[in-house]
Structures are given as structure tokens and as C-alpha cells.
């Protein structure tokens, strides 16, 4: 899923 590519910086789990 390509969403994880840019979803990491807007998601709290990416912190």
C-alpha cells in the first residue's frame, strides 16, 4: 500500500 509512504509523517506512529 502506497499510503504508508506518506502516511508515516502525518501519523503519530511515524514519530
Curated annotation (Swiss-Prot):
Compartment list: Secreted
Tell me the superkingdom of the source. Answer: Bacteria
One GO biological process term: defense response to bacterium
Task: Give an example GO cellular component term for this record.
Answer: extracellular region
Question: What keywords is this UniProt entry annotated with?
Answer: Antibiotic, Antimicrobial, Secreted
Q: What is its main location?
A: secreted
Between which residues do disulfide bridges form?
none
Role this protein plays: Has antibacterial activity against Escherichia coli, Salmonella typhi, Streptococcus mutans, Staphylococcus aureus, Listeria monocytogenes, Vibrio vulnificus and Vibrio parahaemolyticus.
Protein name, UniProt field? Antibacterial peptide fermentin SNR1
What's the source species' lineage? Answer: Bacteria, Bacillati, Bacillota, Bacilli, Lactobacillales
Amino acid at each position: 500500500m502506497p499510503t504508508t509512504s506518506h502516511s508515516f509523517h502525518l501519523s503519530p506512529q511515524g514519530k
